Amino acid sequence: MIAILLAPVYLLANYYLLRRVMGWVKAWFPFFRTARHWALPVAVQAFLACSIVIAFFLPEGRARRVMKLIGNYWLGVLLYVLLAVIAADLLRLLLGYVLPFKHIFVTTQMHRIAGCVCALVILIASIWGVVNARIIHVTPYDVTVDKTVEGMDEMKVVLVADLHLGYNIGEKQMQQMVDRINEQDADLVVIAGDIFDNEWDAVEAPETIAATLRSIRSKYGVYACYGNHDIEEPVLAGFTFRQSEKKESDPRMDEFLKDANITLLRDEGMLIDGKFYLYGRPDAHRPGRGIETRKTPDEITAGLDKDKPIIVLDHQPKELQELADAGVDIDLCGHTHDGQMFPGNLTIKLMWENACGYLQKGKMHNIVTSGVGLFGPNMRVGTKAEICPITIHFAKN
């Protein structure tokens, strides 16, 4: 429903973009002033604008994958084209009509210059966004839990999240992630949800990816919880349509994790090696198959030995105070992507108490990672893909 309501806005944005770009082209090439010369630019614009819709309705296969990738790249480019063109228009309005500089700024020559500057900014932002999205950084944290653990003064946990295996992310990105993880000599590796990108059939060569993930080295193994995208649900430009149906993961997703030697925690916890608890929560909005309502923080810790460290894995950084009050020591999350693309990296901070990074709530440490993968536009601008090795220091025995 939201996608349908926003469709006119999307169409208007593309129309506005076409008018402004063609205005700039005409400033350089006067023969584009006639309507018949608009045919090719209009056709290209229409193809790019409709690519996400075409991909949505195509059957699974190579054509759909290509159209999906084109659409995802276009969404990212469109954002920066709109930002650049709107900024140029506002500046032109200010300098040419509000301030007394019309004779300087409202000219064909200035139109050409403004267009070239916009094109350069768009090109740099888009290329950097694509390249930057493929570079996985290492963001370390150190926290202290005031509890003793027999035979252990510290432990290294590597947090990753938001793999989004599908059209954007495949084996190459996973191999880089595994290489970064294995450099850390981890005691424990955890994946805080959104392993998949809504559609199982979008995962290319799942057997190869599972084999790559099996090569993760960790003393206590690899554990995961599901996120809001770990369900089988067609998505159009980030929006879904089957609102009345219960959202569930494809059983093949579960089998994939088993094949990858990843233990899925679905509203359940484990006492690992008799030393610490690890609890994996289902997603707050889409708990998935067989779970109607996830357990509350108090229900999670009820019956646990609170003299032992309690680590919670939760896709979305929610209920932070409640988890702290319930006795949780460390809460590890993802979901936000840190906004993924400017200006989202600024606005995301208005939506979450901890949009990315570290926050302490009472005695609890909350860490939110920006994730490894991507959702929607195949770019990262102003954010980074990352893994987070967390060194947990315990009280001395």
For the regions a protein language model found, what residue spans apply to each?
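Short, functional N-terminal and low-complexity linear motifs
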Residues: 40-42, 57-59, 108-110, 145-149, ...
